């Protein structure tokens, strides 16, 4: 197995408005697209294999070939975003790779001892994602995403 297409860097923040304003004002990054997730009633979210309530506020922006995802946890005690913020503070949380087969990729990684930390449905219908428990192994979390059909790499249109 080889992960070949990195499409996103995820950054956890305490104040999404402040962070996006600073990135825009100082570095000219933007415009940002904001969303609260889950954004559909049928969206599912699991942390360490158990369904958990969660609410996030996110901002997305394309910067060259990579998308930046800024994440502010709003609700829910049991999730990797709040855990990261509580233990490490703000910062780079994950790198996301597209995968052609979520089930096959996760199965191959489990054979190597890498477990799914959290997973769920994506913003776009039909999208699945899995955040892998790789912090101790490589110093950051790896996220996988699968969407049916061709993917342009962007989380939202």
Regions found by a protein language model. Name each.
Residues 19-20, 57, 105:
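Residues within well-ordered alpha-helices
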Residues 30-83, 125-149:
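Conserved short beta-strand elements that form part of the metal-binding/catalytic scaffold
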Residues 6-14, 58-67, 69, 84-101, 103-157:
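Vicinal oxygen chelate
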Residues 1-46:
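Long, hydrophobic N-terminal alpha-helical segment
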Residues 76-98, 114-124:
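A short, hydrophobic/aromatic-rich structural module that often spans a beta strand
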């Amino acid at each position: 197995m080889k992960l070949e297409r990195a499409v996103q860097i995820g950054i956890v923040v305490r104040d999404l408005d402040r962070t996006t304003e600073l990135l825009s004002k100082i570095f000219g990054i933007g415009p940002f697209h904001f969303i609260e997730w889950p954004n559909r009633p049928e969206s599912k979210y699991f942390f360490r294999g158990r369904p958990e309530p969660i609410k996030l506020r996110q901002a997305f922006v394309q910067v060259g070939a990579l998308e930046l995802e800024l994440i502010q946890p709003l609700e829910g005690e049991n999730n990797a975003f709040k855990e990261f913020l509580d233990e490490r503070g703000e910062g780079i949380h994950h790198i996301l790779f597209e995968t052609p087969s979520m089930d096959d990729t996760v199965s191959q990684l489990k054979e190597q001892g890498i477990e799914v930390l959290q997973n769920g449905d994506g913003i776009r219908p039909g999208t699945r994602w899995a955040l892998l428990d790789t912090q101790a192994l490589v110093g950051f979390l790896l996220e996988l995403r699968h969407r049916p059909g061709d993917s342009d790499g962007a989380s939202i249109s």
